[in-house]
Amino acid sequence: MVTTPRLVSLLLLLALCAAAAGALRLPPDASFPGAQAERLIRALNLLPKDSSSSSGRHGARVGEGNEDVAPGQLLERRVTLPGLPEGVADLGHHAGYYRLPNTHDARMFYFFFESRGKKEDPVVIWLTGGPGCSSELAVFYENGPFTIANNMSLVWNKFGWDKISNIIFVDQPTGTGFSYSSDDRDTRHDETGVSNDLYDFLQVFFKKHPEFIKNDFFITGESYAGHYIPAFASRVHQGNKKNEGTHINLKGFAIGNGLTDPAIQYKAYTDYALEMNLIQKADYERINKFIPPCEFAIKLCGTNGKASCMAAYMVCNTIFNSIMKLVGTKNYYDVRKECEGKLCYDFSNLEKFFGDKAVRQAIGVGDIEFVSCSTSVYQAMLTDWMRNLEVGIPALLEDGINVLIYAGEYDLICNWLGNSRWVHSMEWSGQKDFAKTAESSFLVDDAQAGVLKSHGALSFLKVHNAGHMVPMDQPKAALEMLRRFTQGKLKEAVPEEESSTTSFYAAM
């Protein structure tokens, strides 16, 4: 009998897992990632939904009058959302659908908010993670122009990132938010499909808005966007180098509390938990027995593909799940806080808001069901989860693309320690000098809002008094971070430019 190297590797992985399980039994949900996805979604007081089987998403058309859009084309409308104060003028707010080419029927939904300041402000795109969570979570709870009050009215966010940028929020991959397809074959499973879709969208977006094509362009996002963003940035950069289409003026990208290098970041879970007194030393030593099989599984994932990647997900998440069994009701997005019942945050107003017929009519989504976080997208991306996306970043740094990795200090799930470790271990020409660079205070209003380390094109910022969602927890510091980063002045305090538009918003 001939045994293939791949089979030998998988058998060895199973043996390692069995050995570890002798000291620490696998949690009952370790082999059921769908259960973990639902638990994470319900903690936000959102309803887990399977976007691939949602009848309201199949065959529906975009906008009033069953308007449709041809493949490779974009349908956009100016938007004034219900709930805004009366008498507010046209603010340059847009919503639209992009019909993805090279798909069977996929359509990508987005919001675009022009800057409250100058047309020349940078264009920024924001990607929410999950995978499978809508970027509208960021629009209304983090860094968008407004927040939703309990009476469903909209309140201006004086620290919205549209104050200093022309910002795009995209629902992706297909099946997230208002993005949908009538054909399950359009489901994405890896970063190649995701980044190609986003690149195609940008090409058509800038044709629709040629007045912004010369503006600096930055990619931002958080959580699983630590996977999306490096792949997307590489796709844009390669497209520019090969003159594939419209040149996109990519200047940099920023990842907040992201998952980028799982081998390093999963190993940091127990160190962070011990440092924050979430677990005891005996727990630390017991749970650490899962680290060798996790590392081995991730190595197999990088060479053997899908089956090994699924095994890596299940083995490695045993580390996180084991910690969570010990921390009780602690909020894994912000360990300073307690979850109330199953709820760690209450984002339910978002689903109520998008259930309003007037809102749906204003943004042109017709009868498409809103999926705040999709379990089907989450599960479709599982074989992508344990892949290392750090590998593409050094080439971008060498070509002068600025990179900012930032992390709120109280997040467990994508903690600052794991992010700091992969940033420091990344091999590039400035690695040694970056390691030797002294940390400096990141000051906002003359108070320390974080600790910054920066050399060349690479910066790492640990944000104080923040959890997983930095723009929600520290909105002013997050806005100031974006301002300085896009101006290439992270180490400096940048004066806020006053304009009539800024004054108008500040008064509201």
From Swiss-Prot:
SUPFAM superfamilies: alpha/beta-Hydrolases (SSF53474). It comes from the Eukaryota. One of its GO terms (biological process) is proteolysis. Residues 1-19 form the signal peptide. Substrate binds at residue 414. Residues 48-67 are annotated as: Disordered. Residues 20-80, 492-508 form a propeptide. Disulfide bonds join 133-373, 301-316, 339-344. It catalyses: Release of a C-terminal amino acid with broad specificity. The keyword Hydrolase applies. The active site is at residues 223, 411, 468. GO terms for molecular function: serine-type carboxypeptidase activity. InterPro entries: AB_hydrolase_fold, Peptidase_S10, Ser_caboxypep_his_AS, Ser_caboxypep_ser_AS. PROSITE patterns: CARBOXYPEPT_SER_HIS (PS00560), CARBOXYPEPT_SER_SER (PS00131). The keyword Disulfide bond applies. Keywords: Carboxypeptidase, Disulfide bond, Glycoprotein, Hydrolase, Protease, Secreted, Signal, Zymogen. This is Serine carboxypeptidase 3. It comes from Hordeum vulgare (Barley).
